[in-house]
């Protein structure tokens, strides 16, 4: 394993100020919101956007985004073509590293403890992209990264299914209670 700064393994930059590129004649484009619908997916909205926007601000599969304000929510992008706004940092992992593994490292409590040290501000604490770039990560070889990344993804899928099962069980319970109240 080797300690590397985040900037050594990925391009790290902030998103774009979307309001500068809103154009009524532009193409309807999905823009990521700073709110997440649940712990497994991003929320987004559509806006007419000019074609002058730099391609780097469009998501690519495997991009990792982190909210620059607390709680510094982290997500991995599964689709190309979303505009990433300025309140996110984009971590575009280099080819020699596994995006899934890096995503799980950045989602960890240990990483968030390191991140907390660099947060600035009073009521609204934010992280600067320059500080984010300087955070060091312990990185194994690519083969191990891929193995760990796949394993962590399976754990996430299992947790998602457990949550889904709980939601369905709660709905069944509520339905049965309602039918009993109505006397059916």
Which residues are covered by each model-predicted region?
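Non-catalytic DNA-recognition/assembly elements of restriction-modification systems
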Residues: 1-28, 37, 138-184
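Sequence-specific dsDNA recognition surfaces
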Residues: 5-20, 34-61
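Short, surface-exposed loop/turn microsegments at beta-strand edges and helix-strand junctions
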Residues: 22-29, 56-59, 76-87
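A short beta-sheet element
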Residues: 67-106
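A short glycine-rich beta-alpha junction/loop motif
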Residues: 82-86, 121-146
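Glycine- and charge-enriched low-complexity intrinsically disordered segments
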Residues: 100-122
């Amino acid at each position: 394993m080797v300690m590397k700064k985040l900037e050594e393994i990925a391009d790290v930059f902030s998103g774009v100020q979307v309001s500068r590129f809103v154009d009524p004649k532009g193409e309807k484009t999905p823009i990521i919101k700073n709110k997440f619908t649940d712990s497994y997916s991003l929320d987004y909205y559509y806006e007419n956007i000019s074609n002058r926007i730099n391609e780097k601000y469009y998501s690519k599969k495997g991009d990792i985004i982190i909210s620059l304000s607390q709680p510094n929510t982290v997500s991995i992008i599964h689709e190309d073509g979303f505009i990433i706004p300025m309140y996110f940092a984009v971590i575009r992992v280099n080819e020699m590293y596994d995006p899934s593994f890096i995503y799980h490292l950045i989602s960890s409590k240990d990483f968030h403890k390191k991140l907390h040290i660099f947060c600035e501000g009073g009521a609204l604490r934010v992280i600067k992209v320059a500080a984010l770039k300087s955070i060091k990560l312990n990185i194994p070889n690519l083969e191990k990264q891929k193995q760990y990344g796949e394993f962590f993804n399976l754990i996430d899928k299992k947790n998602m299914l457990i949550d889904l099962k709980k939601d369905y069980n709660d709905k069944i319970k509520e339905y049965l209670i309602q039918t009993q109240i109505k006397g059916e």
